[in-house]
Swiss-Prot record:
The keyword Nucleotide-binding applies. GO terms for molecular function: ATP binding; CCA tRNA nucleotidyltransferase activity; tRNA binding; tRNA-uracil-4 sulfurtransferase activity. Keywords: ATP-binding, Cytoplasm, Nucleotide-binding, RNA-binding, Thiamine biosynthesis, Transferase, tRNA-binding. NCBIfam families: tRNA uracil 4-sulfurtransferase ThiI. Residues 60-165 form the THUMP domain. InterPro entries: Rossmann-like_a/b/a_fold, ThiI_AANH, ThiI_fer, ThiI_N, THUMP_dom, THUMP_ThiI, tRNA_STrfase, tRNA_sulfurtransferase_ThiI. GO terms for cellular component: cytosol. SMART domains: THUMP. The gene is thiI. This is Probable tRNA sulfurtransferase. It catalyses: [ThiI sulfur-carrier protein]-S-sulfanyl-L-cysteine + a uridine in tRNA + 2 reduced [2Fe-2S]-[ferredoxin] + ATP + H(+) = [ThiI sulfur-carrier protein]-L-cysteine + a 4-thiouridine in tRNA + 2 oxidized [2Fe-2S]-[ferredoxin] + AMP + diphosphate; [ThiS sulfur-carrier protein]-C-terminal Gly-Gly-AMP + S-sulfanyl-L-cysteinyl-[cysteine desulfurase] + AH2 = [ThiS sulfur-carrier protein]-C-terminal-Gly-aminoethanethioate + L-cysteinyl-[cysteine desulfurase] + A + AMP + 2 H(+). The keyword tRNA-binding applies. GO terms for biological process: thiamine biosynthetic process; thiamine diphosphate biosynthetic process; thiazole biosynthetic process; tRNA 4-thiouridine biosynthesis. It is found in: Cytoplasm.
Length: 401
């Protein structure tokens, strides 16, 4: 007898009341997309549980993929049997024997959801525990802190038995909270912001500003690689690459140096907002952390935000750099982000940017340069690509040279 299914437990979705089914269906769709290569599996879902029937598929690679699906609180390999005491005892014994159990401790945690079943939880704990003790060597009982917690759940459709919980990433299913545009540079912060936005259920489309010849194709490939890492958590992601050279040059030549950074950020936000409208998103996500750099002071954010009424979401706003780096390492974007390729955020950087800019001044300076035609041209010439887990990486890119 082998584990024949994976039991998935929901997290925050259980608080959603009448809307819960919408979240559960979204999670089911996301799990199905993630596991599309495993053609024999079948997914069954209920209001409070989801099951993946393995049907002979190997569980190890499936478990690895489930660890990155937002909306999953935890999951376990499971066995299902009929609601008959002897069969439950034998199935529980088989589940324990498939684990390293020599010298370990265990307990039984029985739960009788089906109240028609003739044995209560305490009786089940005793009967199953005694059966396991009689038929194993080197296994002892510890009801307070066991090495193995054998969970037995008797439901109307059958009894489910699990022995080990694997933590999921938590959060909400990607797409359950709507869609937002992620302003994605080549740095450390914005990929982390994208990851955290997806954890809150947002589907994201990435927007990157590309300024050739000042930025190279390697910088562009670096951003593609970052998006590819994010597809581990959100599936396919659209990447919009905006040609930004003419806009940046116009700002650099016409706007005073100390205000050029603020004006550049305002232009970026205008373009992102236009793309948001075109692609029917409801918010913009940035990697800003309050006070980290000159453009991320509260005064700067206020002036930059003035160009739109669209909600700006800043998942990193209260984090320090060490916290952000820790997450970047966890999601495997850090080493890509620190590759030494210039992006549009690092070129034309003023020596002494204003940390407390005045809105009236930046509006006055921008009145001397007509940026709107350049912004519209950049939007019209934006390149859009769809990135998935199979897109070419930097290593494959290097083989072209």
């Amino acid at each position: 007898m082998k584990y024949d299914r994976i039991l998935i437990r929901y997290g925050e979705m259980t608080t959603k009341g009448r809307n819960r089914n919408l979240f559960v269906r979204r999670l089911k769709d996301n799990v199905a997309k993630k596991l599309h290569a495993f053609q024999n599996i079948k997914i069954e879902y209920m209001r409070d549980r989801m099951y993946i029937l393995l049907n002979g598929e190997p569980h190890e690679p499936i478990i690895d993929k489930l660890k990155n699906v937002f909306g999953i609180h935890s999951f376990s390999l499971a066995m299902k049997c009929h609601n008959e005491l002897n069969e439950i005892k034998e199935t529980a014994l088989a589940a324990v024997k498939q684990l390293p159990h020599e010298g370990k401790t265990f307990k039984i945690s029985a739960r009788r959801v089906d109240k028609q079943f003739p044995y209560g939880s305490s009786e089940l704990n005793y009967e199953i525990g005694a059966h396991i003790l009689r038929n194993t060597d080197g296994l002892t009982v510890n009801v307070h802190d066991p090495d193995i917690d054998v969970r037995v759940e008797v439901r109307q459709e059958g009894t489910y038995i699990t022995c080990h919980d694997i933590p999921g990433p938590g959060g909400l299913p990607v797409g359950s909270s709507g869609k937002a545009m992620l302003m994605l540079s080549g740095g450390i912060d914005s990929p982390v912001a994208g990851y955290l936005a997806m954890k809150r259920g947002l589907e994201i489309e990435a927007v990157h500003f590309f300024s050739p010849p000042f930025t190279s194709d390697r910088a562009k490939q670096k951003v593609i690689d970052l998006v590819k890492k994010l597809t581990t958590y959100g599936g396919k992601i659209k990447l919009h690459i905006v040609p930004f050279t003419e806009v940046q040059q116009a700002i650099y030549t016409q706007v005073p140096n100390e205000y050029s950074l603020i004006s550049t950020r305002r232009a970026m936000l205008k373009i992102t907002d236009a793309l948001r409208q075109r692609h029917r998103a409801l918010a913009i996500v940035t990697g800003e952390s309050l006070g980290q750099v000159a453009s991320q002071t509260l005064e700067s954010m206020f002036v930059i935000n003035d160009v739109t009424t669209t909600p700006i979401l800043r998942p990193l706003v209260s984090m320090d750099k060490i916290e952000i780096i820790d997450i970047a390492k966890k999601i495997d974007t850090h080493d890509i982000s620190i590759l030494p390729y210039e992006d549009c955020c690092t070129i034309f950087t003023p020596r002494s940017p204003k940390t407390k800019p005045k809105k009236e001044k930046v509006v006055h300076y921008e009145s001397f340069v007509d940026l709107q035609p350049l912004i519209e041209k950049a939007i019209a010439n934006t390149e859009t690509m769809v990135i998935d887990e199979h897109s070419a990486t930097e290593d494959e890119f290097e083989q072209l040279f």
